[in-house]
Amino acid sequence: MSKVKSITRESWILSTFPEWGSWLNEEIEQEQVAPGTFAMWWLGCTGIWLKSEGGANVCVDFWCGTGKQSHGNPFMKQGHQMQRMAGVKKLQPNLRTTPFVLDPFAIRQIDAVLATHDHNDHIDVNVAAAVMQNCADDVPFIGPKTCVDLWIGWGVPKERCIVVKPGDVVKVKDIEIHALDAFDRTALITLPADQKAAGVLPDGMDDRAVNYLFKTPGGTLYHSGDSHYSNYYAKHGNEHQIDVALGSYGENPRGITDKMTSADILRMGEALNAKVVIPFHHDIWSNFQADPQEIRVLWEMKKDRLKYGFKPFIWQVGGKFTWPLDKDNFEYHYPRGFDDCFTIEPDLPFKSFL
């Protein structure tokens, strides 16, 4: 049979998806984290893989889903949090713009799965299934109550789940995970479609969302989930030593406040007394597309006058950041290769060919 007749949509998908195959899985497994450091990889959106010098592997908010895929229904889901926020009716054109850089079903070495909150782009049934099927049978699933309710509903045994709220501490090998207050006001209006938010005092944030501080022997990482800007970042900065902070950044559409702005990211870094602040989430949704260089430009304008003690870092999805080795870098670039050029004799017609 000819190739053009044997190839199907399904064979095409299986041969090209996930786009990075197991490349990043292999890179993470092979990484030997040096003493006095920690390594992390950006998985897209707010997904992070963190690896410590003791070999602890944890993933946070690893999501393997997609956004809008069809114009079929021109209207937003009734009761959606964005509809509540802005009184809109039209479909939100949020298409996923980031490739899938990690294969959940190729994960073998993992010590904990974490989620900051239960929004669809921060917790994933495919990740849960892959870990349950292919990894050790004692890997815990850690998150606030709403996340644990989801995991249990998907079939994760209750005894594998750990509910955390601000103030709780969980130890995973040599990583101490501190659950802290979250400031995700969008989470408070994520309600059942038939439930009204107008005129009703929101229920507590603690069951819905948490921020995390990961204390490793090589440094600390602050993961803010989908939190908006809050004065309480300064409280967290007073109470904890924070090396690297991650903040959800994006260009909010008209009538919407769901992501931190460039100014908010700088305020967050300053309030937390962080050494490095890294924006994320701006990569994933087409309608929240934002240029992180804006953060760096604003930082350059303010850093001397306000005596900033932190630097911004512009990352790329799938890229690695190692603390403290990368603390003075401003931007990530994927490995360029060809470092072994001229280790063998080139095969060219003549030397001046190129």
UniProtKB/Swiss-Prot annotation:
<dbReference type="GO" id="GO:0019854">
    <property type="term" value="P:L-ascorbic acid catabolic process"/>
</dbReference>
<keyword id="KW-0963">Cytoplasm</keyword>
<dbReference type="Pfam" id="PF12706">
    <property type="entry name" value="Lactamase_B_2"/>
</dbReference>
<dbReference type="InterPro" id="IPR023951">
    <property type="entry name" value="L-ascorbate_6P_UlaG"/>
</dbReference>
<dbReference type="InterPro" id="IPR001279">
    <property type="entry name" value="Metallo-B-lactamas"/>
</dbReference>
<protein>
    <recommendedName>
        <fullName>Probable L-ascorbate-6-phosphate lactonase UlaG</fullName>
        <ecNumber>3.1.1.-</ecNumber>
    </recommendedName>
</protein>
<comment type="pathway">
    <text>Cofactor degradation; L-ascorbate degradation; D-xylulose 5-phosphate from L-ascorbate: step 1/4.</text>
</comment>
<dbReference type="InterPro" id="IPR036866">
    <property type="entry name" value="RibonucZ/Hydroxyglut_hydro"/>
</dbReference>
<dbReference type="GO" id="GO:0005737">
    <property type="term" value="C:cytoplasm"/>
</dbReference>
<keyword id="KW-0378">Hydrolase</keyword>
<comment type="similarity">
    <text>Belongs to the UlaG family.</text>
</comment>
<dbReference type="GO" id="GO:0035460">
    <property type="term" value="F:L-ascorbate 6-phosphate lactonase activity"/>
</dbReference>
<dbReference type="GO" id="GO:0030145">
    <property type="term" value="F:manganese ion binding"/>
</dbReference>
<dbReference type="InterPro" id="IPR050114">
    <property type="entry name" value="UPF0173_UPF0282_UlaG_hydrolase"/>
</dbReference>
<comment type="function">
    <text>Probably catalyzes the hydrolysis of L-ascorbate-6-P into 3-keto-L-gulonate-6-P. Is essential for L-ascorbate utilization under anaerobic conditions.</text>
</comment>
<dbReference type="InterPro" id="IPR048021">
    <property type="entry name" value="UlaG-like_MBL-fold"/>
</dbReference>
